[in-house]
Amino acid sequence: MDHKKTSIRTTALAALVLGAVAAPAFSAPVDQATYNGFKIYKQQRCETCHGATGEGSAAFPNLLNSLKNLSKDQFKEVVLKGRNAMPPFEANKKVAEGIDDLYTYIKGRSDGTVPAGELEKPQ
């Protein structure tokens, strides 16, 4: 039996277990509307253009900044009707029916009340 390999495996396993226990949670509890909006953002792949946290890219708008200037009605019009490179989503049932929740999530990110990262499903 190779004690050196066994010792390394044991140490690696212990580090893995302790790391998992000591690792901070990367999710935050939120209300149902915010959680629904978060799920729509992820499932409808908004992050493809606007980034995982809504901060955009060189080619696509930073939604966090945009929501500092757009009203809820203006946001809904842009998402549902489209604008410039933004395609319209009014034919997308999930987006159209969940537009208020999507706004709630992105507005919360914009205002700093909703953290970046995964969100916990409300109890």
Curated annotation (Swiss-Prot):
Residues 1-27 form the signal peptide. Binds 1 heme c group covalently per subunit. Keywords: Electron transport, Heme, Iron, Metal-binding, Signal, Transport. It comes from Methylococcus capsulatus (strain ATCC 33009 / NCIMB 11132 / Bath). One of its GO terms (molecular function) is heme binding. The keyword Iron applies. The keyword Glycosyltransferase does not apply. InterPro entries: Cyt_c-like_dom, Cyt_c-like_dom_sf, Cytochrome_c550/c551-like. It comes from the Bacteria. Heme c binds at C46, C49, H50, M86. This is Cytochrome c-555. Coiled coil: none annotated.
